[in-house]
Amino acid sequence: MALVPYEETTEFGLQKFHKPLATFSFANHTIQIRQDWRHLGVAAVVWDAAIVLSTYLEMGAVELRGRSAVELGAGTGLVGIVAALLGAHVTITDRKVALEFLKSNVQANLPPHIQTKTVVKELTWGQNLGSFSPGEFDLILGADIIYLEETFTDLLQTLEHLCSNHSVILLACRIRYERDNNFLAMLERQFTVRKVHYDPEKDVHIYEAQKRNQKEDL
């Protein structure tokens, strides 16, 4: 849910974005996410990919308790909030312009004892990566962040920096255009990639990626 243009073709699809609150139930909590389509656009609404990825995390598909996780292009922060409620130590990131809105959702939905293990931090892909330790996170999460082709190289550089050989990347997305497949092809040059989930109702895929080790490349 990064700050990118987005095409929504149906009137019904747009209506849900104009609601000031989107309410969800995850991890035995009611989560109320503020939305602000009119003023902040795509970064301030909940996209289907975030819902599907949050559901996948709640299913227990990956171990979260006690693990370090980062959400990229977090937008409203739903995925990071769910990961924190499920026990992860989460860093929730987006560009500077989105941070105050993101913080408001995190503070409204996480109990104080979980907020102490959760960080909201600026991250523009490909920039100032030195503020993050190489291979810092066990789990890297992204929902609907594969979109603008001109960001692909920076996103790959960011993933490469944040991942260790043991890190797991989970990317939730719709495959709308050829450029989406192009990104997956670029990802496969540096990572082992497999599809682990598909939601037919929302037409959202989840891909898991891990760094290729040297033995695989020989």
Swiss-Prot record:
Reaction catalyzed: L-lysyl-[protein] + 3 S-adenosyl-L-methionine = N(6),N(6),N(6)-trimethyl-L-lysyl-[protein] + 3 S-adenosyl-L-homocysteine + 3 H(+)
Family annotation (Pfam families): Methyltransf_16
Transmembrane helix recorded as keyword: no
GO MF annotation list: ATPase binding; heat shock protein binding; Hsp70 protein binding; protein methyltransferase activity; protein-lysine N-methyltransferase activity
Primary localization: cytoplasm
Gene Ontology annotations for the cellular component aspect, listed alphabetically: cytosol; nucleoplasm; protein-containing complex
EC number(s) given by UniProt: 2.1.1.-
Keywords, in A-Z order: Cytoplasm, Methyltransferase, S-adenosyl-L-methionine, Transferase
Gene Ontology terms: biological process: negative regulation of chaperone-mediated protein folding; protein methylation
Disulphide connectivity of cysteines: none
InterPro entries the record matches: Methyltransf_16 (IPR019410), SAM-dependent_MTases_sf (IPR029063)
UniProt subcellular location: Cytoplasm
Binding-site residues for S-adenosyl-L-methionine, renumbered to this chain: W47, G73, A74, G75, D94, W125, A143
PANTHER family in UniProt: HEPATOCELLULAR CARCINOMA-ASSOCIATED ANTIGEN, PROTEIN N-LYSINE METHYLTRANSFERASE METTL21A
Record family assignment: Belongs to the methyltransferase superfamily. METTL21 family.
Summary of the function given for this chain in its UniProt record: Protein-lysine methyltransferase that selectively trimethylates residues in heat shock protein 70 (HSP70) family members. Contributes to the in vivo trimethylation of Lys residues in HSPA1 and HSPA8. In vitro methylates 'Lys-561' in HSPA1, 'Lys-564' in HSPA2, 'Lys-585' in HSPA5, 'Lys-563' in HSPA6 and 'Lys-561' in HSPA8.
Subunit organization: Interacts with heat shock protein 70 family members; at least some of these proteins are methylation substrates.
Protein known as: Protein N-lysine methyltransferase METTL21A
Organism: Homo sapiens
